[in-house]
Amino acid sequence: DALVFYRLGDFYEMFFEDAKIASCELDLVLTGRNAGVKDRVPMCGVPFHALTGYIQRLVQKGYKVAIVEQMEDPALAKGLVKRDVIKVVTPGTVIDELFDERSSIYLAAVVDYQYGFALSICEMSTGETTVTHIPRNILHLQQTLLKNNIREIVVKEGFDEKFIRAVRDLSAVAISYCAEDQIGEEYLPLCEEVSDGAQREAYGLMLNYLIETQMRMMH
C-alpha cells in the first residue's frame, strides 16, 4: 500500500498507478514508456538529490513511500541490476532528514480486546513508548488519537470496521496493518515491565511494524 520510488541512475522513478498518483500530488509530468505491453506504461520521476522534499510532501498528505535502491553497480551487474526496498517512510515513522525537530511524531498500535482498546504509543524521535487502556468507544478513541497527536495507527487485519471508519474521519491520522504481534526473543528485554496481556500485544504489534518498515536500512 506504499508508493514505490525506484532508483534508476540519477532519478527515482514511479510506474503505473503509483506514477499517476505521484504526478497528481507532486505536480510532476506524467509520461510513458514501451515495456512490451499493449499500452505505454505510465511513469514519472524526480531527481535523486530532491528526493527528501518530494517524500515529505507525500507523507504530509498521508501516503507511505517505499524506497528501492540499486544494490550493485550497474556497470558491474550481469543482467538486471539487483534492487531492494531499503526503507518504508510512513506518516507515523518519518524520522532522520525528513523529521521536523519542532514537532513530535507519534505512532500508535491499537488492539481490540473484550473490555476496550489497548494502545502502545511511541514518540519516534526519542523512542519513548507508553502503553495504556481506553474504553471501547468511538469518540474516546478519536479523542485519544487527537490528544496525543497520533500521526498513524497500526492495527491487525479484521479490526472492527466501524472504528476504522471513525479513524478515517480524522484526516490527519493514517491507518496501517501488521499481521504479527508476537515479540521476538531478542526484543523481550524492551517490554519487561509490560505485564498486561492486551498491552503487551499492542506493544508487539507496534514493534513488529517498526521492524517491518524501518529495520531494512540498518542492515
Segments predicted by a language model, with ranges:
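Basic, polar low-complexity surface loops/patches
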Residues: 1-219
